[in-house]
Every structure is written in C-alpha cells, then in structure tokens.
Amino acid sequence: GSIFTANSTRFDKDRLVYPLSYYMEYLAMGMKYDIPEFLGMCNTIFDIIEEKKIPSPECLIYLMLHPEYRSFEYEGRYEQPDFARFYEDSGILRARKGHYSYTVMREKSNFLYFHNGTSKLEMKVAGSFCEHRAFKAETMEILADGTAHLHQTMKGWYYLPFEEKPETSDWWKMDQSSRKKKLGPDMEIDVYVKPAEGGIDVRVVTDGVSGAPWRVELAFSGIEFMASEHVMLPVNGSEVLVIKDPELEAYNEKDSLLIGPGFGEHRFTEGKEDSEAKTPGAVTVYFTDYTAFD
C-alpha cells in the first residue's frame, strides 16, 4: 500500500509514504466521473489506515463543504492488477505480479528494488575502477521477452606524468589539465532482469577488465531471520554477510525472499574511498567475484 519513492526528486525521496493525501482527489474524481477504481481506492486508503494504525487524511473541511460527500456510500475495494510498464523517458520499469512487485531504474546505483509484502530488497553492483564506484546504467531497454537490459561502459584512464617539470611542488597549484591521459581499458557491465515464475532472474555480466574485485550488494529491509543450508541467524539490520550457499532465505513472520545461488570469491566488501554507504537499517548480503564474471 505504500508509494514507491526511491526515484523521487522531492523531499519524500526514500521515505515511507502512503497515499493518504490523495483521498479527496480519488473521492471527487470517482464521484464526478463514476470511476469505480477511484472510489474503491478511497476504501482501500482507509483499510491501510486501520492496518497500519496511522492518522487519517485531513478531509473534515471538504466533508463540511460538500454534503454529497457525506451521504455517498461505496462498498468496493481497489484490486491491484498485474502489470509491467516501462517509462522510457524516465528510465524506469515498474512491474507487479500477485503480491510482489519490482522496479528497475537507469542511472541509479540502487538499480533494482523488489518488494514482497512486508520485505524489501535493493540491489547494487559495486566495485572500484578508476573514478567509478558502482554500476549506474547509461542505457536501458526492454527485450522481447520482457527482460530489462541495462548497460554501462566505464571508461578507464589515468594521468601521465607532466611532460615538463611544474614550476611548483604544491599539487593543488599544478596545472593538472595540461597532463596527457592514458586511455583504456574500458569495463563493460550488462545487467539483465528477467521475469520468472514466482519472482525474477538477475544476470550480471562484466567484461573488459580482469582481476578487479567486484560485488553484488543486496540490502534487505523488513526481515527478522536469514537462513541457508548451514546457518539460521536472527538479524537486526546491521549485519554484513558474504554468502556462498546455493540459496538464502530472508524472512519475517509474514513474508520471505529466496535468493541464490550465492558466490563468494573475496571479502573485499567495503570498497575504496568515495564508495557509497550501505543502506541504513538494512541487512547487507554480498555475492563477490573477480572481473570478468557472468
């Protein structure tokens, strides 16, 4: 019932927001144009309020000014349909099937969000290569089978020494722009997010650079336990794990997420300077390998 805000450019970015403030708009438009989905959403909003024990929208003034609102009755509820929609200009794919949904985004390091009821997963592909610290797709397309294909070319380069000795020994006063650059190699990263039975398949392909320690970062929110073939752990949101087991279950008393297969070829999970921080309050799981990998 909450609104997806990870791509917001406003004050509500990454906040937990419910559609309470839209109640009057749904009611007015639903009544005026006889739109059952809008009227059902009005009832669904109050179902959310009762379930979450949160304050109701401030609508008293509207009910006082419009007697027709006070006398109107509607019994239905809004039933969320399955859908998959790609907003090409924004670079966002939103999809829902049953009670799980997912979002894929271009130009975001947290490029994948997967919600299953009360549990949430965020995914990054991260590592250090020149000035780059994480994968941020430059392009995004939807293939014929519904797969989201994201791609980034990370340009490799470094400064060559000064051709002539600088007049100063102060690094910050040197004319760095006068130095020539050694270009290459480039790292190519492709990510494929494919709809699958009961969830999604994610494929990560790196190429062009050999031996760089990169990682797939999975941040879990709303979970209480993690279990694999060899361990079951209660979690509180501060844990950091590298998982090599074939399958990992992250769950609470209502919902669960199954992830796998795991792989762990190194323990370099912190990244270098300027690496992005972990998601606050989330359990962080890593799958790690050296480039190039698939």
Segments (PLM) and residue ranges:
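Extended polysaccharide-engagement surfaces of secreted carbohydrate-active enzymes
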Residues: 1-238
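Beta-strand-rich recognition/accessory modules
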Residues: 219-221, 235-237, 242-294
